[in-house]
Design a protein with these regions (language model features):
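Short, acidic, metal-binding catalytic loop of nucleotide-sugar glycosyltransferases
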Residues: 22-32
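A conserved acidic beta->alpha catalytic loop
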Residues: 23, 39-48, 64
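Short beta-strand/loop segment that forms part of the nucleotide-sugar
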Residues: 32-41, 60-62
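Glycine-rich, basic loop-to-helix element that forms the pyrophosphate-binding segment
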Residues: 61-79, 89-91, 100
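Acidic/His-rich active-site region of diverse nucleotide-sugar glycosyltransferases
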Residues: 70, 92, 99-181, 186
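Short aromatic/hydrophobic "clamp" motif used to bind/position activated sugar donors
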Residues: 84
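Catalytic donor-sugar/metal-binding loop of nucleotide-sugar-dependent glycosyltransferases
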Residues: 178-189, 194-216
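Non-catalytic, C-terminal membrane-associated alpha-helical segments of glycosyltransferases
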Residues: 229-234, 248-305
């Protein structure tokens, strides 16, 4: 089987990263792999702990938090594998996952990125991802296929094109990345893998879902807590994604929808939830998109922990 690089990014979650390494050690043949851990500006340098678990890992430490894309890009640049599997550090792999995903890609050279079935770690009979529907460019909304369905084998063996991959687990060819480009770092977090998929599709590649294997993701089924950081980047990047990928007509329609419907609705929700402290971050996200170019690396938010 082709040599594969597994890339994961750690940010102040050493225990999760160690659990991922343990699952790799248990379930995958290390002779065909290189494991790259990028520490994304964590408060504590845990490289020695990671190497104690798997001495052969390649450990890269960034003094700054470069975001989801920036951290993964550091790992991609260091990778020597023909194939690269990027996984969140809060995932755990199963036997043969790399072999199955490589087989999918080798069977169809048009595949640019493939993501497996994703199951919730704490409720392994529940599906988190089985593909994405296409984006509605007038609202910047789409749906996750399979979300919250009980896993009764309904996606087992299914191999199909989908609109977008899932950032928790993505395999692609190193050669394709070198041709198409690294993950866009303008987002910092949220929407970057969707934009990357758009880049691959514009280059003639397909985004793929495979139900022939799966991965467990420790992201909670419950909705994550609202925060200033989440409010700002979700809002900012939703607009930015449309600016970077939609036609001018759709950008105009989206602009009216977002300012006249989506933002007022969100303000009402925050008022009802007694989270009026988050409303200024909606305004800040809008202001950033008005004042910054769509390829600006200025985040507009202090991300230092």
């Amino acid at each position: 089987m082709a040599f594969t690089s597994i890339v994961t990014v750690n940010y102040n979650q050493p225990e999760a990263t160690l659990a991922l390494l343990a699952s790799i050690k248990l379930n995958l043949n290390s002779d065909d792999l290189e494991i790259i851990i990028v520490d994304n500006g964590s408060l504590t340098d845990c490289g020695a702990r990671f190497k104690q678990c798997m001495p052969q890992i390649i450990y890269i430490r960034s003094e700054a938090n470069l975001g989801f894309a920036g951290g993964n890009n550091l790992g991609i640049k260091a990778a020597s594998g023909e194939y690269i599997l990027m996984v969140n550090n809060d995932t755990e792999v199963v036997k043969g996952i790399t072999d199955v995903l490589i087989q999918e890609m080798e069977a169809n050279p048009e595949i640019g990125i493939v993501t497996p079935l994703i199951l919730y770690f704490d409720q392994p009979d529940t599906i988190q991802y089985a593909g994405y529907t296409p984006m509605n460019y007038t609202t910047c909304r789409n749906k996750t296929e399979g979300l919250m369905e009980k896993n009764a084998g309904q996606y087992a063996g299914i191999s199909k094109e989908t609109a977008y991959c899932h950032g928790a687990a993505m395999m692609c060819r190193k050669a394709d990345i070198m041709n198409i480009g690294l993950m866009p770092e303008v987002y910092f977090l949220y929407y970057e893998e969707l934009d990357w998929c758009e880049m691959f599709k514009k280059a003639g590649k397909k985004i793929w879902f495979s139900g022939k294997t799966h991965i467990f993701h420790k992201e909670s089924i419950s909705v994550g807590r609202e925060s200033a950081l989440k409010t700002y980047f979700v809002t900012r990047n939703r607009i930015l994604f449309i600016r970077r990928n939609a036609s001018l007509v759709n950008q105009i329609i989206f602009g009216f929808y977002f300012t006249c419907v989506a933002i007022p609705k969100q303000i009402i929700i925050y008022i009802l939830k007694k989270r009026t402290d988050l409303i200024p971050y909606l305004r800040r996200a809008l202001t950033w998109n008005i004042t910054q170019a769509k390829d600006s690396l200025k985040l507009g938010f202090n991300t230092v922990a």
